[in-house]
Amino acid sequence: MSYTIAAEIRTEIGKGSSRRLRHANKVPAVIYGAGKEPISIKFDHKDIINIQENADFYSSDLTITVDGKDVKVRVQAMQRHAFKGLIEHIDFKFA
């Protein structure tokens, strides 16, 4: 099964801006690898929380739409809050 997720480019990077995103129910993320420049992005938490419950989310290629362009990626790592179950950050790798 393939998933398509809409994302926005992040202009502010760092701990403070990531915290502000999380308080606004956004998930900070980064796409990196394959000799390309890393792309810092953000998602709506509700968009990602439901699809990440499927095992296919972690093992198959995903499509992330960033500024109208489709980018094929795989989940590399995901950080969660210790007891709330919220997603705090996702690392994607170019597929």
UniProtKB/Swiss-Prot annotation:
Q: Keywords of this protein's UniProt record, alphabetized?
A: Ribonucleoprotein, Ribosomal protein, RNA-binding, rRNA-binding
Biological processes annotated in GO: translation
Alphabetical list of InterPro entries matching this protein: Rbsml_bL25/Gln-tRNA_synth_N, Ribosomal_bL25/Gln-tRNA_synth, Ribosomal_bL25_short, Ribosomal_L25_dom, Ribosomal_uL5_bac-type
Q: Does the keyword Oxidoreductase apply?
A: no
Note whether Iron occurs among the keywords: no
What the protein does comes down to: This is one of the proteins that binds to the 5S RNA in the ribosome where it forms part of the central protuberance.
Task: List the protein's name.
Answer: Large ribosomal subunit protein bL25
Lineage runs: Bacteria, Pseudomonadati, Pseudomonadota, Gammaproteobacteria, Alteromonadales
